[in-house]
Amino acid sequence: MTDYDRITANPHFDMLMSAHNHVQSTTQSALVPMVVEQSARGERSFDIFSRLLRERVIFLTGQVEDHMANLIVAQLLFLEAENPDKDIHLYINSPGGSVSAGLAIFDTMNFIKPEVSTICMGGAYSMGSFLLAAGQKGKRYALANARVMIHQPSGGAQGQATDIEINAREILKTRARLNEILAERTGQSVEKIEKDVERDYWLDAKEAKEYGLIDEVLERRPASL
């Protein structure tokens, strides 16, 4: 049985594709292209994102929020179950979003056995840049005209003064943890990370490489991808 037949025969594949298609239909304003393929099981049609998932390609596009994070996590776990020794490729074009949703993806990337390469196309900002840097070291890429931005987490609170104080402490604690992770992923000192993220810190692809957020700027597809 080929990898194609084995994956599509998996009883969880159709459920995963159904959830994937639902999210794509609600997050894509344009018509999603469909591909039709022949296999030993007959003719099947897939949206283009589902077809690429079979090639171990995951797209992280748009706002990082809980529902999207759950889908990304499910795809990572599914691909690990299919082949724990083969790389997964995570393409990122995201303005960022929820810290908790982003950390769920980050922790899963580290939890699973396959190495996860990250590729920025367009832009990776805020939590998007954090997940870009979270890829396997040596396998973090950005396309030539991609942009990256890092900054500190933002948040707000209302209500009693004690509740506001509790929320403020939690934000500071989260910021410190994110800075520690970025320092480890980039090779920069925590002090430099703290200084740079005080305001929006923009980098082009070459600057992102120099900073340590990525390992290589791509103009053409390498053999590893």
Curated annotation (Swiss-Prot):
GO molecular function ontology, one term from the record: ATP-dependent peptidase activity
Membership in a protein family: Belongs to the peptidase S14 family.
Chief location: cytoplasm
Alphabetical list of Pfam families matching this protein: CLP_protease
InterPro entries: ClpP, ClpP/crotonase-like_dom_sf, ClpP/TepA, ClpP_His_AS
Cited HAMAP family: ClpP
Cellular location(s): Cytoplasm
Gene Ontology cellular-component annotations: cytoplasm; endopeptidase Clp complex
UniProt cross-references to PROSITE patterns, sorted A to Z: CLP_PROTEASE_HIS (PS00382)
Keywords, ordered alphabetically: Cytoplasm, Hydrolase, Protease, Serine protease
Protein name as annotated: ATP-dependent Clp protease proteolytic subunit
Keyword Protease: yes
Binding partners and assembly: Fourteen ClpP subunits assemble into 2 heptameric rings which stack back to back to give a disk-like structure with a central cavity, resembling the structure of eukaryotic proteasomes.
Assigned EC number: 3.4.21.92
Known role: Cleaves peptides in various proteins in a process that requires ATP hydrolysis. Has a chymotrypsin-like activity. Plays a major role in the degradation of misfolded proteins.
Source species of the chain: Psychrobacter arcticus (strain DSM 17307 / VKM B-2377 / 273-4)
Catalysed reactions listed for this entry: Hydrolysis of proteins to small peptides in the presence of ATP and magnesium. alpha-casein is the usual test substrate. In the absence of ATP, only oligopeptides shorter than five residues are hydrolyzed (such as succinyl-Leu-Tyr-|-NHMec, and Leu-Tyr-Leu-|-Tyr-Trp, in which cleavage of the -Tyr-|-Leu- and -Tyr-|-Trp bonds also occurs)
Presence of keyword Protease: yes
Gene Ontology annotations of biological process type: protein quality control for misfolded or incompletely synthesized proteins
Active site: residue positions: 126 (nucleophile), 151
